Amino acid sequence: MDTALIVLLFSELIGYSFWIYFTRTETERYRDITSFVMFMVALVILMRVFQLNLDFGFVLLMASGLAALSWIIGKVLGIEELRKESKSYFWILIIITCVRSFTYEPYQIPSRSMEPGLQIGDFVLVNKFAYGLKFPGTHFLLTALQTPKRNDVAVFLPPHTLCEVDPKEARPDIINLNMNESQSFLNRFNSLQQNRCTEMGIKYVKRVLGVPGDHVEIKGYEVWLNGIKVPHTIQGEDEKGVLIKESLEGAEHFIRSQGTSGYAEHSWTIPAGSYLAIGDNRDNSLDSRAWGYFSDKYLIGKAEYIWLHWPTFSKLPSFSRNGKIQ
């Protein structure tokens, strides 16, 4: 756990204790000062949570627990104001937690790795029950796991963003690689993990190209799935690269290629419990070609709809890109 976050949480707890004391003794001036300080500390805690990329579902769950505790304290100590306010916040937080954890969660696209379909500033809705429901803030499944399908645009935690993950978990088939390939992967993975890993991981959104048992090859912008070339047609070319329409599992989507990828030719045979995820912007995507497979253990959900486009704060939000994700 982050030391700064622990100190902030402990400070908030001390402030909360003082607030209860000043409320009981009817010392309004000190109570109001304590309330203001607690509010400012809470804002700093939220900033730290976002900096650490912690699961916001876990934050909501903790806030719900604190509201429930305050409700009980208010009732036991006879602090009517605390009891009423805590009761209201508790039910509001529980509803928000349930909606976000068990139905749909908003997610903002942070990079160009899924262009042209998903652009920086797109806000998408992630279906949290598409692959089975999990207890908020954890990887514990509450319902049976539903496996991702080829062509799904999935949100997940890639292995290199989790400090606890061993490189062999990212490539369980590493023993089947030759010495140069395995060493190259280990060096690349360890470097990425050292620079990007957190305790809670970082959410990525990519397209699932391979499921367990599949043999996948990428040759330039061509994808071969179990020995069959995935149909594609070149739509045109501009300063950003070649625009290609690809048809996978009977559904069409657009990809972009510049022909510059360092992993232009590679092949995988996907092991059990693992999935191959590639960005639609083929030469500008940090994906399975660099860090291996993602595990079904770290699935978050399926990105289904674009509901808002807001690339920068200097521009007004737009609904022009709203629609189902291809």
Name each region found by the language model.
Residues 1-33, 37-45, 63-67, 77, ...:
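Soluble "head" domains of membrane/secretory-pathway proteins
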Residues 104-114, 129:
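Membrane-bilayer interface helices and TM-boundary transition segments
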Residues 77-105:
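Internal/C-terminal transmembrane anchor helices
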Residues 39-49, 96-102:
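Aromatic-anchored segments of alpha-helical transmembrane domains
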Residues 71, 88, 97, 101, ...:
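Residue-level signal for well-ordered alpha-helical scaffold segments within enzymatic catalytic domains
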Residues 88-89, 93-94, 98, 110, ...:
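Generic hydrophobic alpha-helical membrane-segment signal
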Residues 98-106, 250-257:
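Short charge-dense sequence patches
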Residues 49-86:
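Alpha-helical transmembrane-segment detector that highlights a single hydrophobic TM helix
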